[in-house]
């Protein structure tokens, strides 16, 4: 800002001619005086700027919240080039205003606010750190004991998880047992799982039938429900019955199952799936009708053109040539191109 103003005044001749020694008039300030007033923040000017303008020098820098703050232009000078010397205040009044402005801020370093919140990292006490190390060492020793006991008795990690489900009603996966033995679980989860595994170790030592229970549970878990396959003849019969009665009662389901030689659950599930399929089909059909009612994105309509010979991806039309559907842009009446028969389309002819 100062450099811009100085450059503007550098090309304006001082009133009265000469080099400006004739004096200053209202509305104009000597650029040399203006430049002398602009010094380093908080420091003295290059020349007699403050003395010439009749103001007290800028007070020194003061500390503010751990940093250095400097005073800016004081005593409400505004744009100095637009203010004449006659309108400047005396030195006493200017100094008083500077003092009044500086009284609002303390020259001492600012103290901490009483309501200031300090975020400090909470470090555990030596006792807590010792307890944590002792707990981690105990978990490490128990994990080694569990792995040794499991291998000695011939249990797999999956067997341990299934046995916990038989004993306590909650099955744990093989991955969980593996991570516990490898100390890869969080400390919270390790502490939750440790009592259950301790009871498993006791049961494994005292109960000889635990291995048989584990094997039976493994067979139950391994038994998967096979996918039911229905013959085409039976499927057509079910489809015919569905058209007559989409939602049969329990007695009707039992009668249909006995008639077709199927289980009642199979018939019930088939009718339920068939109703859901019908709902999806009706929704798709309604969406298709709405799409056709609103019209295609291209107003010209669909036109089929034969594709050139060669391999094409798609389903052939039972020996008929492949066609592709294109949308033509409608032309105004009287401006359409004459129709060209399909047989006339072929390779371009070159004239000599």
Swiss-Prot record:
Keyword presence, Ubl conjugation: yes
Result when mutating residue 215 to R: No change in sumoylation. Loss of sumoylation. No change in nuclear localization
Biased composition range(s): Polar residues: 99-108
Region (Disordered): 1-48, 91-115
InterPro entries linked to this entry: HD, Homeobox_CS, Homeodomain-like_sf, Lambda_DNA-bd_dom_sf, POU, POU_dom, POU_domain_TF
Keywords noted in UniProt: Cytoplasm, Developmental protein, DNA-binding, Homeobox, Isopeptide bond, Nucleus, Phosphoprotein, Transcription, Transcription regulation, Ubl conjugation
Effect of residue 211 to R: No change in DNA binding. Loss of self-renewal ability in iPS cells. No change in nuclear location
DNA-binding annotation, residue ranges on this chain: 223-282
Cellular localization per UniProt: Cytoplasm; Nucleus
Covalent link (Glycyl lysine isopeptide (Lys-Gly) (interchain with G-Cter in SUMO)) residue numbers: 118
Endpoints of the signal sequence: none
Pfam families registered for this protein in UniProt: Homeodomain, Pou
Modified residues (Phosphoserine): 106, 229, 282, 347
GO biological process terms held by the UniProt record: blastocyst development; blastocyst growth; cell fate commitment; cellular response to leukemia inhibitory factor; ectodermal cell fate commitment; endodermal cell fate commitment; endodermal cell fate specification; gene expression
Region (DNA-binding): 173-179, 186-189
Post-translational modification as stated in the protein's UniProt record: Sumoylation enhances the protein stability, DNA binding and transactivation activity. Sumoylation is required for enhanced YES1 expression.
Oligomeric and partner information: Interacts with PKM. Interacts with WWP2. Interacts with UBE2I and ZSCAN10. Interacts with PCGF1. Interacts with ESRRB; recruits ESRRB near the POU5F1-SOX2 element in the NANOG proximal promoter; the interaction is DNA independent. Interacts with ZNF322. Interacts with MAPK8 and MAPK9; the interaction allows MAPK8 and MAPK9 to phosphorylate POU5F1 on Ser-347. Interacts (when phosphorylated on Ser-347) with FBXW8. Interacts with FBXW4. Interacts with SOX2 and SOX15; binds synergistically with either SOX2 or SOX15 to DNA. Interacts with DDX56.
Role summary: Transcription factor that binds to the octamer motif (5'-ATTTGCAT-3'). Forms a trimeric complex with SOX2 or SOX15 on DNA and controls the expression of a number of genes involved in embryonic development such as YES1, FGF4, UTF1 and ZFP206. Critical for early embryogenesis and for embryonic stem cell pluripotency.
Comment, domains: The POU-specific domain mediates interaction with PKM. The 9aaTAD motif is a transactivation domain present in a large number of yeast and animal transcription factors.
Protein name: POU domain, class 5, transcription factor 1
